[in-house]
Structures are given as structure tokens and as C-alpha cells.
From Swiss-Prot:
One of its GO terms (cellular component) is peroxisome. It catalyses: an (R)-2-hydroxy-long-chain-fatty acyl-CoA = a long-chain fatty aldehyde + formyl-CoA; a 2-hydroxy-3-methyl fatty acyl-CoA = a 2-methyl-branched fatty aldehyde + formyl-CoA. Signal peptide: none annotated. Thiamine diphosphate binds at E49. This is 2-hydroxyacyl-CoA lyase. It comes from Schizosaccharomyces pombe (strain 972 / ATCC 24843). Peroxisomal targeting signal 1 (PTS1) is a tripeptide located at the C-terminus of more than 95% of all peroxisomal matrix proteins. The prototypical PTS1 is the terminal tripeptide SKL (serine-lysine-leucine) but the consensus of PTS1 is defined as [S/A/H/C/E/P/Q/V] [K/R/H/Q] [L/F]. However, this description of the PTS1 consensus must probably be expanded beyond the terminal tripeptide. Mg(2+) binds at D447, N474. Gene3D superfamilies: 3.40.50.970, TPP-binding domain (3.40.50.1220). Its cofactor is Mg(2+); thiamine diphosphate. GO terms for biological process: fatty acid alpha-oxidation. Binds 1 Mg(2+) ion per subunit. GO terms for molecular function: 2-hydroxyacyl-CoA lyase activity; magnesium ion binding; thiamine pyrophosphate binding. The lineage of its organism: Eukaryota, Fungi, Dikarya, Ascomycota, Taphrinomycotina.
Amino acid sequence: MSISFSELVAKTLLDLEVKVVFGIVGIPVIEICEAIQASGIRFVGFRNEQSAAYAATAYGYLTQRPGVCVVVGGPGVVHAMAGVFNSKTNRWPLLLLAGSSETFQQNCGAFQELDQVSYLSPHTKLAVRPPSPKMVVDSIRRAYRVSMTGTPGTCYVDLPANYIESTVDDFPKDPLPPIPSSPKCAPDPTQLQKAAYYLKNAKAPLLVVGKGAAYACAEKQLLEFVEHTGIPFLPSPMGKGLLPESHPLNVSSARSAALRNADVVLLAGARLNWIFQYGLPPKWSPNAKFIQIDTNAETLGNNAADLDLAIWADVGLTIDCLFKLVQTWKYSVGISTPYLRTLNETRSKNEKKALESRKSSIPLQMNYALYVVNEELQSLSLKSKRNITWVSEGANTMDRGRQLLEVTHPRGRLDAGTMSTMGVGMGYAIASAFAHSSDKIVVVEGDSAFGFSAMELETAIRNQLDLLVIVINNNGVYHGLDTDAYETLRDNHQLPTTALGTSIRYDQICEACGGKGFFVKNEEDLRSSLRKAWQTSSVSLINVMVDPEAARKLTFAWMSSTKVKPKL
């Protein structure tokens, strides 16, 4: 009995319990993609390899199993490299499969020839070409396992065209067992004792919850820890939702005060990178001590972190063990400390200020538009008992959405991540529709960010996915121009580098692909469109025109300076 190579690849993925594969067909992988689909695995064909690879990385994050992406060789691999980089920097598991030139045509100028194993090796955990067609089973299974073991990342398997055209006689006829999830590493007891000592002696402790804790599914342990100890917490943008945003110990509204005053900081799957200003003054206290919990050893001790207080282990296991050591200690339950009073006063002041700024106007202000989006959709979510998974992308839109869009459940928000990568939005949304199929997937993007992957609207519509896409349209990158200024400056060839076309009808692109589009300029139409789109079980796009903010100074919460420095 023989089997085609493509069928063997599909069987291997099926044995691994892969449910969905993202990619783009082409020579020579079209036969593999068709075999995958024939096996019962869902194949989602994209319009661009970048988006397909981004989708696979997000699926890996949401499921804690490698997302699988199939692309053609040469330029297809180069395009998919964006997803490989995304996987590496965010530490999400990805299995990339790609076609390649025939082995006997190597170095002959073959069709789309590229030494893909060498090209990808520096950026992956494993990059292999099976030594023979029958060895593809071992290669894929090994790559799948390595991708999610230890620090998650990308593994690559090269599939030469002459392999794809071959048949295999010697292969495992019975289903192979699935690969179990990655084993979890327990913390060093000595490091735990140190961490417990510092926490118990802290005057101003702070728990920082990162997306590493979200990937570790540590929400139960974190909630128990916070509610018992009374330590205030601050979630990273993708750590939001692990703990209730309405929790009285959530100090997101007093972020600057929390960073400036904390003396002992417990980092649960969060990195001291640009998102948290490296742990350095003036954003942080110069005397702050950082207790790091991370599964990536190379991260430990970075920037202001102290390697002596580092814990190389699973976040959930570590918090559970640490909780047992501090069970007899409480920081603030039932009491008020000067540190907590400062945080509460700052939070109340900032929340009052935010409330006062919520005023309807024409044109709509971006902050108010986002406030309306959150208020309306949270109400609809509550009535329908259906969670929202947010996908947020853009500069201003993402930065402000971090504060204004409420996340109600773990892993309920995806954004541009560690590298602040633009173009991930639609790929992430499509992945979320498969990983969180019971949720309403809501994509909130700036108009410039949406342009990176707008044609994936057709992918979502073709696959009959339930997505609500909201484009916050200010006619530009960061900020834009009104129509009069745009036309005057364009005629003189003096358009600012940040300017995009005015009032572009992104809603009509959605309608042209078979979806539902809404074009809104005021609060009443925005609320009405949100209600209609919520009831739609296919793809809807609401194009929200907001103030271009041409005169607004560029500032972001993560910037160490209020001035945008030029790239050298």
C-alpha cells in the first residue's frame, strides 16, 4: 500500500489533532493544501503570506498549540518571514511548512529557488528538510513538539517539489498519538523564598501581569494571589482580562503613579522592555526591586531586573507556590497604606478627567468614538451573554484603545505585541474566529493600519466568519488632514508624510467583497451601526470618521520623551 507525499503530510497533521491550517496555495504546495482539506482539516486560504503567518502565530497564542502555516517557496517564505519574526519576538508557537525547489536542481536557478533552511535557521528554533520523503512524519512531529516546548517559537519544515510529487510505501498506517502539551517547569525553592521575603517586607508592592501569564493560562492562580494578599496589579496591554478590569486593586488608571512609587515589583510573564520603560528611572523608582517570572532564561536579568531575584519557571506554577509561602501575610486587605491612598487618589482623578472629556461632537473625537464603541458593545455583550475578543491595531487607535476598550476575559485582547507590528489585525481576527469561535470578534483599527491587510476582508467573508471590523478613520498615519487642506497641499505636492486620502470608503471595500458596510460621522449613526453589526453573523465594517487632529502633538504612554525622534 502506498500513499502520496501530500496525503502523508495531511495524515501527520491530522494525527497531531491540527484543526485548521492557514496559508496560500501555489506550486508546489497546492497538492498538500488539497490533501489537508480532504483529510477534514480546515484550510484557510489568505491573500497574502504575511497575514496567513500572522494568523497562525495568533492561533498558537490563543490555543497554546502551534499554529500551522503552509506557503510556497522563495518569495512566499520571504513574505511569511514577518510571521516568523512575530512568533519569535512574542514567543508564540508556529509551525511553518513551505514548498521548495527540487533537490536535484539545487544551485541551478530553479523556480523560486531559495536555501530556505539556511534562510530561516537564525530565526527559528528548528529548520529542517526531511532526509527522504518518508521521514517527513518524523520531521513534522519533531518540529511541532519543539515549537511549543520551553520558550515557544517557530519551527520550519522544508518540502521539496520532488518529494511532493512522490509516493511513500513505508509509513505508519495506524494513527500516531498526539503530542502532549509542553511540560511546565517548577520554580527553584531558593528563589521562591527570596521572592516571598521581599514581598513581605515591601512598603509599596506591585504585580505586573504580562501576556506571558496569559499564554500560561495563569488567571486562576493570579486572582487567588491578588485577592488574598491585597497587592495592587497592573496588566500589560495583552495581560488585560486575566484579572477583572473592575477589580479595586487594578491600578491601570494610575499607571504612572504605580510605576513611580513601587518598591518591589513582581513581574508575572511581563518583560522590562519598552512597554514598561525598561524598569528604569524616571518612570520607575531608582530603588525598585524586580522579581521576574519567565520561561525564557535569556530574558531574566534584562535592563533593571536583578538576576538574583529571577525565577525561571512557569508563571502559574510559580504564583501557586509563592501563594503558599505568603498565605499568612496580607499587604492591604482591610487596610489602607500611604501607597494605596496615592494610587486610589490618582486613579479617581484620572477617571474623573476621562469622564469629563467624553463629549459628543462633529467631527467625532477619537477618544469619544472609542468610548461609544466600548459602551455600546459591552451592553450588547452582556445582553447576549457573548464575550468580545478584541483585536486592536494602529498607533493612536491602539494606544487609546488600551485604556478605553474593556477586556472581560483572559486572552480577550490581541494587539500589535512586543514589536508593535502593523499589519497583524485581520490575520489575528481570522485566527480568533477559529480559536474563540463562540466570541464576537471585534477588530478596532486605525485607517493606516487597516491598509496593511484590508484585502483579508475577502478571506473572512469567503470563510463565512463572524467579524465586526471598526476602522477609526482620521485620514492619516497618526493624524491626517481635512478635505480642504488635503486638496490644497496635494495640488502643491506638499502633502505631509502622515497624510492619507480623505474619507476613504473602506466600508465599500467590505461591501464589494460581500460583507456589510457602514459609513458614520456622528454618535447616533455609530451607535445604530454597532447594534446592527452585532446582530450580523458575517463580516461587517464600520468606517468611523473622526477628527484628523492635524495640530495634535504626538505623544504615547510608552514614550520616554514627548518628542518623536527621527530614525537615523
